[in-house]
């Protein structure tokens, strides 16, 4: 087995995060770098910073800091690959169970899938980006277009619009939680 075959990214799972971001699986480059969405062409960090979801500008090397802002990071499948198309069906099946357990344990307000594929593999159904009507363990579900540069179907500005919608949903749910908890 290659030494890098064992590398993956750690989960960042604070208790009761506002948003739990769920990737499909770590890219090989990100796993080698040790940080989520580490490739400079990935639009995750740019959109996160521009959307208002965090009060400071963060880089991939500061992924661990998301917990400070009530945000979490994980993946549906933890094995890194060069492309999500290399993830096997049995890995997705095992990942569904593990992700459901993580969601039940940390109880996020919102589970946010980075990409339609992650949502489709978890729920076994198709959807469009944006807020969803279904819930998982009480959490609202939101789907972002994949922030990967390979996703040419969505421009940077469209992706930013979805991040801003996510920010607005988070703010509404935070307010509602504050009002109902006293």
Regions inferred by a protein language model and the residue ranges of each:
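Short, solvent-exposed loop/turn segments at secondary-structure junctions
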Residues: 25-29, 78-81, 116-119, 147-150
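Short, surface-exposed acidic-centric catalytic microdomains
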Residues: 30-90
């Amino acid at each position: 087995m290659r030494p890098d075959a064992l590398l993956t990214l750690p989960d960042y799972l604070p208790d009761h995060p506002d948003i739990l971001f769920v990737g499909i699986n770590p890219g090989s480059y990100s796993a080698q770098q040790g940080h989520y969405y580490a490739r400079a062409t990935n639009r995750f960090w740019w959109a996160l910073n521009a959307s208002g979801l965090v009060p400071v500008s963060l880089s991939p090397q500061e992924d661990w800091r998301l917990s400070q802002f009530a945000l979490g990071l994980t993946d549906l499948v933890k094995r890194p690959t060069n492309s999500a198309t290399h993830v096997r069906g049995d890995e997705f099946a095992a990942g569904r169970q593990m992700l459901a357990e993580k969601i039940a344990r940390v109880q996020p307000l919102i589970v946010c899938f980075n990409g339609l594929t992650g949502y489709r593999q978890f729920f076994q159904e198709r959807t469009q980006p944006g807020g969803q009507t279904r819930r998982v363990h009480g959490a609202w579900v939101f789907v972002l277009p994949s922030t990967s540069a390979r996703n040419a179907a969505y421009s940077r500005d469209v992706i930013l619009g979805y991040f801003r919608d996510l920010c607005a949903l988070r703010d509404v749910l935070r307010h509602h939680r504050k009002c109902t908890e006293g």
